[in-house]
UniProtKB/Swiss-Prot annotation:
Its EC number is 2.7.7.-, 2.7.7.108. Disulfide bonds: none annotated. This is Protein nucleotidyltransferase YdiU. It comes from Escherichia coli O157:H7. NCBIfam families: adnlytase_SelO, PRK00029.1.
Length: 478
């Protein structure tokens, strides 16, 4: 089957990119590809059998027209000016059979006009982390970009140490970022901001294109998508680590996996990025930061969208987030209905978990085994203050009995939303260290495991992290 690529971005947004081709690596070789995703995209298996090829930027497929996008942004709350694709190149937009499209974005593809002081490269460590994280999030049901392939090489890349150069093929319906809009707003070119909005609506919100109120309705949906995404992050204990405006997707996708981390111990102020000295992007601050980012986007739209309409949409953010968050947390607790004591029970559990530094994922998974008429719980042994747990657990079982559903029905629901497996940093690190020595077994094994996060397991993927893995520090270095 011949893949079809189109050039909407190149043709319709001529001032938002520089056309250029990837710069191949030395002795590049394909070490992993996503068979399931490749099948979904109707990619012939033969493309993965002839060396690095397109996956290493050595060849282009018919119809591809590679380019690097320009955008700007706020980083750690401070205006950073022009940024752009400093190491990534959009190879093309694949047109799928259903009429939708998928960007093919090659990360680590070499120098671009937007590399600033960088070398345009990515390292094996960061490409493995992004591939694992994006696939883990996908199978958790959270909107995200996807990983299609990883290529490693003999090219040395200099970070804190010398690391192997690598490339990641990332795919997504769009790489539209909040920072694209900021770029032209701060250049005082509101007509180009509007052009971006029209492009987004035409291709991703086409049902609004003929509505006279399209900009307001579109921004309302961007707010809602962002609120929903952040709510989902919070329910699985995911910290992004670097929520700059240029790292946020207009479509509400999780984008740019750098110094991310999933909670081990329940620590509301968890900081996963060791460069985040002020805790701006701490786990518990993500909802507030996302609203701040939406406010920055609203500012760029203010020349052609009524400020009252923008503020009305922004005012809806908290309620949308709380609604999504509340629904999912009730499911995680096994509540089939909404009762007035639900929030108090959840907050009391969180207080107990924070005090005891309980493992976030394990606590909710073990809670899924609760039998409403039995005071016995395997979760009890996870707490030192047994009396405090017993008191909370008795009230929790009383709340379960209000819903009048069987244990099996409730447990099935809970186990479908409380994963047994999340991508803890130590699991990724173990796969990385093996891969850097030439052994890809753990990389493939972990990828396979992450496809079934809600299945019961009895291996170390679902055990408590070892001491060395609890406080792994991760930087933006990639």
């Amino acid at each position: 089957m011949t893949l079809s690529f189109i050039t909407r971005w190149r043709d319709e947004l001529p001032e938002t990119y520089t056309a250029l081709s990837p710069t191949p690596l030395n002795n590049a070789r394909l070490i992993w590809h996503n068979t399931e995703l490749a099948n979904t995209l109707s990619i012939p298996s033969s493309l993965f059998k002839n060396g690095a090829g397109v996956w290493g930027g050595e060849t282009l497929l018919p119809g591809m027209s590679p380019l690097a996008q320009v955008y700007s942004g706020h980083q750690f709350g401070v205006w950073a000016g022009q940024l752009g694709d400093g190491r990534g190149i959009l190879l093309g937009e694949q047109l799928l059979a259903d009429g939708t499209t998928m960007d093919w974005h090659l990360k680590g593809a070499g120098l671009t006009p937007y590399s600033r002081m960088g070398d345009g490269r990515a390292v094996l460590r960061s490409t493995i982390r992004e591939s694992l994280a994006s696939e883990a999030m996908h199978y958790l049901g959270i909107p995200t970009t996807r990983a299609l392939s990883i290529v490693t090489s003999d090219s040395p890349v200099y970070r804190e140490t010398v690391e192997p150069g690598a490339m990641l093929m990332r795919v997504a319906p769009s790489h539209l970022r909040f920072g694209h809009f900021e770029h032209f707003y701060y250049r005082r070119e509101p007509d180009k901001v509007r052009q971006l909005a029209d492009f987004a609506i035409r291709h991703y919100w086409s049902h609004l294109e003929d509505d006279e109120d399209k900009y307001r309705l579109w921004f309302n949906d961007v707010v809602a998508r962002t609120a929903s995404l952040i709510a989902q992050w919070q329910t699985v204990g995911f910290a992004h680590g670097v929520m700059n405006t240029d790292n946020m997707s207009l479509l509400g996708l999780t984008l740019d996996y750098g110094p991310f981390g999933f909670l081990n111990d329940y620590e509301p102020g968890f900081i996963c990025n060791h460069s985040d000295h002020q805790g701006r992007y701490s786990f518990d601050n993500q909802p507030a930061v996302a609203l701040w980012i939406l406010q920055r986007l609203a500012q760029t739209l203010s020349p052609f969208v009524a400020v009252d309409a923008l503020n009305e949409a922004l005012d809806s953010y908290q309620q949308v987030l709380l609604t999504h968050y509340g629904q999912r947390m009730r499911q995680k607790l096994g509540f089939m209905t909404e009762q007035k004591e639900d929030n108090a029970l959840l907050n009391e559990l969180f207080s107990l978990m924070a005090r005891e530094r309980s493992d976030y994922t394990r606590t909710f998974r073990m809670l899924s085994l609760t039998e409403q008429h039995s005071a016995a719980s395997p979760l009890r042994d996870e707490f030192i203050d047994r009396a405090a747990f017993d008191d909370w657990f008795a009230r929790y079982r009383g709340r379960l009995q209000q819903d009048e559903v069987s244990d099996s029905e409730r447990q099935q629901l809970m186990q479908s939303v409380n994963p047994a497996l999340v991508l803890r940093n130590w699991l990724a690190q173990r796969a990385i260290e093996a891969a850097e020595k030439g052994d890809m077994t753990e990389l493939h094994r972990l990828h396979e495991a992450l496809r079934n996060p809600f299945s019961d397991r009895d291996d170390d993927y679902v055990s408590r992290p070892p001491d060395w893995g609890k406080r792994l520090e991760v930087s933006c270095s990639s």
